[in-house]
Amino acid sequence: MLVSSNEEQLTAHTPTSSSSIEPKILAACSYSLSVGPCSLAVSPKGVNSKSPSLKNETAFVVDSVSTLSAESSALLYNTQSSLLTGLSMNGYLGEYQEDIIHHLITREKNFLLNVHLSNQQPELRWSMRPALVNFIVEIHNGFDLSIDTLPLSISLMDSYVSRRVVYCKHIQLVACVCLWIASKFHETEDRVPLLQELKLACKNIYAEDLFIRMERHILDTLDWDISIPTPASYIPVLDPIFFLVLDASMFVPNLFKFPASKIACSVMNIVNEHVGSFLLTHPSMESYRKDDNFLWPEDLDTVTSYMENMSKRYANEECTDLLFSSLGRISSILAKKYPEQCAMAAWCNMTEKDTERTL
């Protein structure tokens, strides 16, 4: 049963004059949320949009090309090196591999979302969620926060919404505070967004004390247990192509029923299958194939054993199909965040022109 979040204590503040603070997010932000009773519409700046819409979700299509630039070819080839480096740096290839995975699997069982409870929200609708995720992604990108902060902020928001009644006029506040909590968890102190910056990102519609009170309310609701395993926890790699697919998974509510390990496994399978096939067959990669260590550097067996181990133990065909279908329509915010990787995905047939997102 959803519990009321005590609306009387969370009253929207009358907009104040513009703050002197000019965070990076304002320059980067091209979309704004219209927050009101039962409305959560995303509109490009300067454009009026009065009804909830997903028009900003544009199909990302790149015309087929026969050749790639040298820079793009190098970008593709470096994918394999960054995976090895990321796995090695985080201890996933050493003696602690089984311990790390076992701990994450044990923890993730405690954080599976109850979609039925989320469906009981009196005002929020699933059709509003892509706009809200876009809003969080853009703020995250504007502040240049770490990779792990974004999925944790989304997980915190989803967990809170599945336990408390949240009204439309407060959802932007909840989103920003979840990002704030996640940044405090993952970022160094100097990189955590200032309260005044988050207030300005919300166009000053909430008083500063509301951020503090909402933070405490979210933490109390989650019993202060915010170390939530996310798919990013299983993908300790450095290459953005993995995180393009990972970020795209956050837009698919039907993936809620799968634990983070299965989503992570689906991300790795999709990228490996399509990027790997492209590396092996495309003419532009011929010079790289002459390298004795192509597809992976020297530790090929160690890396592939980790990937195969994850696939055999945690792969789920339905999860992979749902995730792959979502790549047919990449959010315009993600396309702006990962321009080269979106092009790479199109070249590698990871995006389909006629694929519709599953909601």
Swiss-Prot record:
The keyword Ligase does not apply. CDD domains: CYCLIN_ScCLN_like (cd20559). Pfam families: Cyclin_N (PF00134). Function in exit from the mitotic cycle. Contributes to negative regulation of the timing of sexual development in fission yeast, and functions at the transition between cycling and non-cycling cells. Interacts with protein kinase A. SMART domains: CYCLIN. It comes from the Eukaryota. Keywords: Cell cycle, Cell division, Cyclin. GO terms for molecular function: cyclin-dependent protein serine/threonine kinase regulator activity. InterPro entries: Cyclin, Cyclin-like_dom, Cyclin-like_sf, Cyclin_CLN, Cyclin_N. This is Cyclin puc1. One of its GO terms (cellular component) is nucleus. One of its GO terms (biological process) is signaling. Belongs to the cyclin family.
